[in-house]
């Protein structure tokens, strides 16, 4: 399935139904009086976070969503029915913005969370509503009020516990494939990864979600390469795993390049706990490895892990370090994976793989009864 993390959609809630002008007509009742009912309220437009989705690709093919109008009022004081609602199903982690792309309407971070982004118009009053002591037979009614019509943006930020960052070909996708059942595209050329990938890793019986994003290069915050937009998918993570390839001629510079892009992106990414690892150590000799380890340690101010996703060297230690930070960030308790956890096992490491309203599902029945 193709990945799409941003979509522009046009929504319109239903217009309210018109009130009815009607008079009671029965045998032997000469002056029955008005009995026109009120019009029904127009349908609402909702967005709802559901599991099982990790892309907004469906909104590439359908961008217009319109709720139905309320039914008009009828005689005998019969009110019109409410128009049918429209619900946009989106992945957990989707943010809804106004047309300016800056004003946040809501952030759907839990399964079943719903938000009303456009309220239906109220139905008009029937002529029975206007009956008074001075006007016993009003012959007018109100039209229904129009619904809301606007453009909104959907922006997906994947929910994961740990995020992988680094230059292109730093071994991020290989790492993800080695410790989870994710199967990202892996090749020996830059920008093999063009969209984020998720996988569930297990270490010592505990699970957490890893997010792999496309590589960053110098100037990514200015649009160089494929830019830095995908960094939004690691904003929600508890920890970043920064991979630097041992094949880089200057590993210290490679580390600082990515660090600079994280700072330029902002949103407190540089404030997150960071684990630094020198990857692909199986392709360099021992003397070169020692030299690059010292250089990277000077650049990042800490001792980097040494790992190889091919031989499995150092992988368990890195996973445990990630797990420990995630557990600590969640109050010291075991973390339940933010996505539905899959039962996975490691590959053999020794082998060579405000108009709106929000609600949860638990509140939905109460709201419908009140409506």
Curated annotation (Swiss-Prot):
Pfam families: GTP1_OBG, MMR_HSR1
Residues holding GTP: 166-173, 191-195, 212-215, 279-282, 308-310
E.C. designation(s): 3.6.5.-
Alphabetized UniProt keyword annotations: Cytoplasm, GTP-binding, Hydrolase, Magnesium, Metal-binding, Nucleotide-binding
Positions with biased composition (Acidic residues): 356-371
Residues given in the record as Mg(2+) binding sites: 173, 193
Keyword rRNA processing (UniProt): no
Location of the region described as Disordered in the Swiss-Prot/TrEMBL record: 337-371
Gene3D superfamilies xrefs: GTP1/OBG domain (2.70.210.12), P-loop containing nucleotide triphosphate hydrolases (3.40.50.300)
GO CC term, one of those recorded: cytoplasm
MF terms (GO), sorted A to Z: GTP binding; GTPase activity; magnesium ion binding
Matches recorded under InterPro entries: G_OBG, GTP-bd, GTP-bd_Obg/CgtA, GTP1-OBG_CS, GTP1_OBG_dom, GTP1_OBG_dom_sf, OBG_GTPase, P-loop_NTPase
Biological processes per GO annotation: ribosome biogenesis
Location in or out of the cell: Cytoplasm
Residues in OBG-type G domain copies: 160-327
Function: An essential GTPase which binds GTP, GDP and possibly (p)ppGpp with moderate affinity, with high nucleotide exchange rates and a fairly low GTP hydrolysis rate. Plays a role in control of the cell cycle, stress response, ribosome biogenesis and in those bacteria that undergo differentiation, in morphogenesis control.
Subunit field text: Monomer.
Similarity field: Belongs to the TRAFAC class OBG-HflX-like GTPase superfamily. OBG GTPase family.
Official protein name in the record: GTPase Obg
Protein's organism: Rhizobium rhizogenes (strain K84 / ATCC BAA-868)
């Amino acid at each position: 399935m193709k990945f799409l993390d941003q979509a522009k959609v046009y929504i319109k809630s239903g217009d309210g139904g018109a009130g009815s002008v009607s008079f009671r007509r029965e045998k032997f009742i000469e002056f029955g009086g008005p009995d026109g009912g009120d019009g029904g309220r127009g349908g609402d437009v909702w967005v709802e976070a559901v599991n099982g989705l990790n892309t907004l690709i469906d909104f590439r093919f359908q961008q217009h969503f319109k709720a139905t109008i309320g039914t008009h009022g009828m005689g005998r004081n019969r009110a019109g029915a409410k128009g049918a609602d429209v619900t946009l199903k989106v992945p957990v982690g989707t943010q809804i913005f106004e047309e300016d792309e800056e004003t946040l309407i809501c952030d759907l971070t839990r399964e079943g969370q719903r938000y009303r982004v456009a309220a239906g118009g109220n139905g008009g009053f029937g002529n029975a509503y206007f009956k008074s002591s001075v006007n016993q037979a009003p012959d007018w009614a109100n039209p229904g009020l129009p619904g809301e019509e606007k453009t909104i943006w959907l922006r997906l930020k994947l929910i994961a516990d740990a995020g992988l960052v680094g230059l292109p070909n730093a071994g991020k996708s290989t790492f993800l494939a080695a410790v989870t059942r994710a199967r990202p595209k892996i090749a020996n050329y830059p920008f093999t990864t063009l969209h984020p990938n998720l996988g569930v890793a297990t270490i010592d019986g505990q699970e957490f979600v890893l997010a792999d994003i496309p590589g960053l290069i110098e100037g990514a915050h200015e649009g160089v390469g494929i830019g830095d937009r995908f960094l939004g998918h690691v904003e929600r993570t508890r920890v970043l795993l920064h991979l630097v390839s041992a094949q880089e001629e200057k590993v210290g510079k490679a580390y600082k390049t990515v660090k600079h892009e994280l700072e330029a992106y902002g949103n407190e990414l540089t404030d997150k706990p960071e684990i630094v690892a020198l990857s692909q150590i199986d392709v360099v000799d021992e003397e070169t490895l020692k030299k690059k380890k010292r250089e990277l340690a000077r650049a990042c101010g800490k001792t980097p892990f040494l790992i190889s996703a091919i031989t499995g060297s150092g992988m368990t230690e890195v996973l445990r370090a990630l797990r420990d930070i995630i557990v600590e960030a969640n109050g010291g308790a075991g973390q339940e994976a933010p996505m539905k956890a899959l039962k996975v096992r490691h590959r053999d490491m020794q082998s060579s793989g405000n108009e709106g309203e929000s609600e949860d599902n638990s509140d939905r029945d109460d709201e419908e009864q009140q409506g």
